[in-house]
Amino acid sequence: NVAIGRDALSALNIATAANTYNTAVGSSAGAAVTTGVENTIMGGLAADALTVGYQNVAMGYNALGTEQGGSRNIAIGVAALGTQNIGTTAATHYNVGVGALSGTAITTGSRNTLIGGLTGMALTDADYNVVLGYNALPTDTLGSRSTAIGYSALNNQNFTTATDSYNTAVGFYAGLSVTTGINNTLIGGLAGDALTTGSNNVAVGEEALSTDDLGSK
């Protein structure tokens, strides 16, 4: 184990032989870890609430900051996955958040891949989302199984009840205005950017379906 910084890995039970290969660098980095293996924690307050966890990577101030019992999460960036698992000891697994505030509001969601600043920043209990690009899918809270790739893709999608959206938006501003529509495939810059509540649409090409706001199928 390697601990560098005030209170880094300060709670780790080194008398237990299995607690090995942990690295924590920064003030209070991994400060609450009692049982853990192969965690890499770098940054002030990074994973500072984690008690039991394995093979997590947290890099950046307050990255994975409130996770208590998760494993195999990757959080890179200021407050990335910052509130994951807050208030619960139930384990949350396999989330990837890379970029400032990426997935910062996730509490119990799992298997999300969020790459880019502000990506999926409002998601809480949501699963299986793939989000790449600055500000992509930033307002949705409970939507699952969305794919948003590109600057501000699915920018306004927001399901306030648990919903499998199955929306796919790829391109600059693709699906920009979609709020509660489902099963849409929008590929190309500004594709379906005016669509709001329409469902079951396919739009491929620059500005395809860019003036329809409510249409379905």
Please report, for each region that a protein language model flagged, where it lies by residue.
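Glycine- and small/polar-enriched repetitive beta-structure motifs of secreted/surface proteins
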Residues: 1-217
